[in-house]
Protein backbone atom coordinates (compact mmCIF):
# COMPACT_ATOMS: atom_id res chain seq x y z
CA UNK A 1 0.00 0.00 0.00
CA UNK A 2 2.92 2.33 0.68
CA UNK A 3 4.09 1.89 -2.92
CA UNK A 4 0.63 2.67 -4.27
CA UNK A 5 0.41 5.80 -2.12
CA UNK A 6 3.83 6.92 -3.37
CA UNK A 7 2.69 6.49 -6.98
CA UNK A 8 -0.50 8.46 -6.35
CA UNK A 9 1.46 11.27 -4.67
CA UNK A 10 3.83 11.40 -7.64
CA UNK A 11 0.86 11.68 -10.02
CA UNK A 12 -0.57 14.51 -7.92
CA UNK A 13 2.79 16.30 -7.66
CA UNK A 14 2.77 16.08 -3.85
CA UNK A 15 6.03 15.57 -1.97
CA UNK A 16 5.90 14.04 1.53
CA UNK A 17 8.42 12.56 3.93
CA UNK A 18 8.60 8.82 4.50
CA UNK A 19 7.25 9.41 8.00
CA UNK A 20 4.20 11.23 6.63
CA UNK A 21 3.57 8.48 4.09
CA UNK A 22 3.78 5.85 6.82
CA UNK A 23 1.35 7.83 8.97
CA UNK A 24 -1.16 8.06 6.11
CA UNK A 25 -0.93 4.32 5.46
CA UNK A 26 -1.33 3.61 9.19
CA UNK A 27 -4.42 5.83 9.24
CA UNK A 28 -5.96 3.87 6.36
CA UNK A 29 -5.19 0.65 8.25
CA UNK A 30 -6.96 1.92 11.36
CA UNK A 31 -9.91 3.20 9.34
CA UNK A 32 -10.26 -0.16 7.60
CA UNK A 33 -10.04 -2.05 10.91
CA UNK A 34 -12.55 0.12 12.80
CA UNK A 35 -14.86 0.39 9.81
CA UNK A 36 -15.73 -3.29 10.04
CA UNK A 37 -17.31 -2.74 13.47
CA UNK A 38 -18.34 0.93 13.47
CA UNK A 39 -19.33 1.64 9.85
CA UNK A 40 -17.32 4.87 9.66
CA UNK A 41 -17.25 5.11 5.85
CA UNK A 42 -19.04 3.53 2.90
CA UNK A 43 -15.66 2.99 1.22
CA UNK A 44 -14.62 -0.58 2.09
CA UNK A 45 -11.50 -1.09 -0.01
CA UNK A 46 -8.32 0.34 1.58
CA UNK A 47 -6.84 0.99 -1.87
CA UNK A 48 -9.90 3.02 -2.77
CA UNK A 49 -9.52 4.90 0.53
CA UNK A 50 -6.10 6.10 -0.65
CA UNK A 51 -7.77 7.97 -3.52
CA UNK A 52 -11.18 8.94 -2.15
CA UNK A 53 -10.11 9.78 1.40
CA UNK A 54 -6.36 10.48 1.52
CA UNK A 55 -5.61 12.16 -1.80
CA UNK A 56 -8.98 13.89 -1.92
CA UNK A 57 -8.17 15.47 1.47
CA UNK A 58 -4.53 16.49 1.15
CA UNK A 59 -4.98 17.96 -2.33
CA UNK A 60 -6.41 21.11 -0.68
CA UNK A 61 -3.42 21.70 1.64
CA UNK A 62 -1.68 24.32 -0.56
CA UNK A 63 -4.78 26.54 -0.51
CA UNK A 64 -5.22 26.80 3.26
CA UNK A 65 -4.26 30.12 4.87
CA UNK A 66 -3.40 30.31 8.55
CA UNK A 67 -2.44 27.80 11.22
CA UNK A 68 -5.62 27.07 13.22
CA UNK A 69 -8.36 25.11 11.50
CA UNK A 70 -11.57 23.33 12.43
CA UNK A 71 -12.93 20.40 10.41
CA UNK A 72 -16.70 20.45 10.94
CA UNK A 73 -18.58 17.17 10.59
CA UNK A 74 -15.23 15.41 10.31
CA UNK A 75 -16.70 11.89 10.50
CA UNK A 76 -13.72 9.53 10.68
CA UNK A 77 -11.33 12.49 10.37
CA UNK A 78 -11.81 13.63 6.79
CA UNK A 79 -10.21 15.80 5.63
CA UNK A 80 -8.75 16.77 9.03
CA UNK A 81 -6.51 13.80 9.86
CA UNK A 82 -4.74 13.61 6.46
CA UNK A 83 -4.33 17.41 6.49
CA UNK A 84 -2.87 17.30 10.02
CA UNK A 85 -0.34 14.72 8.84
CA UNK A 86 0.82 16.77 5.84
CA UNK A 87 0.60 20.15 7.66
CA UNK A 88 2.38 19.43 10.97
CA UNK A 89 2.86 23.14 11.74
CA UNK A 90 -0.91 23.73 11.76
CA UNK A 91 -3.47 22.66 14.35
CA UNK A 92 -6.76 20.98 13.48
CA UNK A 93 -9.82 20.71 15.72
CA UNK A 94 -11.90 17.73 14.57
CA UNK A 95 -15.58 18.27 15.38
CA UNK A 96 -18.26 15.60 15.22
CA UNK A 97 -21.45 14.92 17.17
CA UNK A 98 -21.18 11.10 17.19
CA UNK A 99 -19.28 9.47 20.01
CA UNK A 100 -18.09 6.44 18.02
CA UNK A 101 -16.38 8.70 15.49
CA UNK A 102 -14.67 10.77 18.17
CA UNK A 103 -13.49 7.60 19.94
CA UNK A 104 -11.94 6.49 16.67
CA UNK A 105 -10.26 9.88 16.22
CA UNK A 106 -8.76 9.70 19.69
CA UNK A 107 -7.38 6.25 18.91
CA UNK A 108 -5.84 7.57 15.68
CA UNK A 109 -4.37 10.52 17.57
CA UNK A 110 -2.84 8.13 20.13
CA UNK A 111 -1.46 5.55 17.70
CA UNK A 112 -0.11 8.04 15.17
CA UNK A 113 1.18 10.37 17.91
CA UNK A 114 -0.52 13.41 16.37
CA UNK A 115 -0.09 16.35 18.72
CA UNK A 116 -1.63 18.85 16.30
CA UNK A 117 -5.21 17.52 16.40
CA UNK A 118 -7.97 17.93 18.99
CA UNK A 119 -10.99 15.63 18.56
CA UNK A 120 -14.17 17.14 20.02
CA UNK A 121 -17.64 15.63 20.38
CA UNK A 122 -20.14 18.45 19.96
CA UNK A 123 -22.81 19.81 17.69
CA UNK A 124 -21.39 22.69 15.70
CA UNK A 125 -23.91 25.26 16.94
CA UNK A 126 -22.99 24.45 20.56
CA UNK A 127 -19.23 24.65 20.06
CA UNK A 128 -17.62 27.91 21.27
CA UNK A 129 -14.91 29.19 18.94
CA UNK A 130 -12.59 30.79 21.47
CA UNK A 131 -10.37 31.96 19.96
CA UNK A 132 -11.91 31.83 16.48
CA UNK A 133 -10.26 29.88 13.67
CA UNK A 134 -8.23 30.88 10.63
CA UNK A 135 -10.15 28.38 8.55
CA UNK A 136 -13.37 26.35 8.74
CA UNK A 137 -13.08 23.22 6.60
CA UNK A 138 -15.77 20.72 5.68
CA UNK A 139 -16.89 18.24 3.10
CA UNK A 140 -19.93 17.26 5.16
CA UNK A 141 -22.44 20.01 4.34
CA UNK A 142 -25.03 19.56 1.62
CA UNK A 143 -24.89 23.23 0.68
CA UNK A 144 -22.69 26.29 1.09
CA UNK A 145 -25.65 28.07 2.65
CA UNK A 146 -25.85 25.40 5.35
CA UNK A 147 -22.13 25.63 6.00
CA UNK A 148 -21.96 29.38 6.61
CA UNK A 149 -25.26 29.38 8.53
CA UNK A 150 -24.24 26.63 10.96
CA UNK A 151 -20.60 27.73 11.25
CA UNK A 152 -20.95 31.52 11.17
CA UNK A 153 -19.42 31.90 14.65
CA UNK A 154 -16.28 29.86 13.97
CA UNK A 155 -13.94 31.90 11.70
CA UNK A 156 -11.88 34.89 12.77
CA UNK A 157 -12.62 38.25 11.15
CA UNK A 158 -10.01 37.54 8.48
CA UNK A 159 -10.71 33.80 8.39
CA UNK A 160 -12.12 31.70 5.57
CA UNK A 161 -14.53 28.86 4.92
CA UNK A 162 -13.17 26.01 2.79
CA UNK A 163 -15.90 23.82 1.32
CA UNK A 164 -14.88 20.63 -0.49
CA UNK A 165 -17.47 19.98 -3.16
CA UNK A 166 -18.08 17.82 -6.18
CA UNK A 167 -19.76 20.14 -8.64
CA UNK A 168 -19.46 23.86 -7.96
CA UNK A 169 -22.97 24.89 -8.96
CA UNK A 170 -23.59 28.50 -9.88
CA UNK A 171 -27.06 28.53 -8.29
CA UNK A 172 -25.65 27.29 -4.98
CA UNK A 173 -22.95 29.94 -4.90
CA UNK A 174 -25.41 32.70 -5.81
CA UNK A 175 -27.69 31.69 -2.92
CA UNK A 176 -25.14 32.50 -0.21
CA UNK A 177 -26.68 34.68 2.52
CA UNK A 178 -25.81 38.35 2.80
CA UNK A 179 -22.51 38.96 4.51
CA UNK A 180 -20.41 36.40 2.64
CA UNK A 181 -18.31 36.53 -0.52
CA UNK A 182 -16.94 33.76 -2.72
CA UNK A 183 -13.19 34.39 -2.80
CA UNK A 184 -12.22 31.63 -5.19
CA UNK A 185 -13.46 28.39 -6.76
CA UNK A 186 -10.54 26.03 -7.31
CA UNK A 187 -10.82 23.02 -9.59
CA UNK A 188 -9.01 20.13 -7.94
CA UNK A 189 -7.29 17.36 -9.87
CA UNK A 190 -7.29 14.14 -7.85
CA UNK A 191 -5.53 11.31 -9.71
CA UNK A 192 -7.78 8.30 -10.42
CA UNK A 193 -10.84 9.90 -8.90
CA UNK A 194 -13.88 9.98 -11.16
CA UNK A 195 -16.05 13.07 -11.20
CA UNK A 196 -15.35 16.74 -10.59
CA UNK A 197 -13.86 18.09 -7.35
CA UNK A 198 -13.77 21.73 -6.31
CA UNK A 199 -12.68 23.79 -3.33
CA UNK A 200 -14.93 26.79 -2.70
CA UNK A 201 -13.28 29.49 -0.57
CA UNK A 202 -15.64 31.90 1.22
CA UNK A 203 -14.97 34.82 3.57
CA UNK A 204 -17.19 36.99 5.77
CA UNK A 205 -17.64 40.44 4.23
CA UNK A 206 -16.51 42.09 7.46
CA UNK A 207 -12.97 41.02 6.56
From Swiss-Prot:
It is an enzyme of class 2 (transferase). InterPro entries: rRNA_ssu_MeTfrase_G, SAM-dependent_MTases_sf. S-adenosyl-L-methionine binds at residues 73, 78, 124-125, 139. Its EC number is 2.1.1.170. SUPFAM superfamilies: S-adenosyl-L-methionine-dependent methyltransferases. It catalyses: guanosine(527) in 16S rRNA + S-adenosyl-L-methionine = N(7)-methylguanosine(527) in 16S rRNA + S-adenosyl-L-homocysteine. One of its GO terms (molecular function) is rRNA (guanine-N7-)-methyltransferase activity. Keywords: Cytoplasm, Methyltransferase, rRNA processing, S-adenosyl-L-methionine, Transferase. It is found in: Cytoplasm. The keyword rRNA processing applies. GO terms for cellular component: cytosol. NCBIfam families: rsmG_gidB (TIGR00138). Specifically methylates the N7 position of guanine in position 527 of 16S rRNA. Belongs to the methyltransferase superfamily. RNA methyltransferase RsmG family. PANTHER family: S-ADENOSYL-L-METHIONINE-DEPENDENT METHYLTRANSFERASES SUPERFAMILY PROTEIN. This is Ribosomal RNA small subunit methyltransferase G.
Amino acid sequence: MLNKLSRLLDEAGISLTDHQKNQLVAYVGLLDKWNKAYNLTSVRDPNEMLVRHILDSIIVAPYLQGSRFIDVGTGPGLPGIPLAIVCPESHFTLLDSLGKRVRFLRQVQHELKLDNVTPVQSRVEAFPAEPPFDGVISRAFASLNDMVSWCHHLPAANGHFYALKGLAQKEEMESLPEGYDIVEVIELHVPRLEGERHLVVIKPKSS
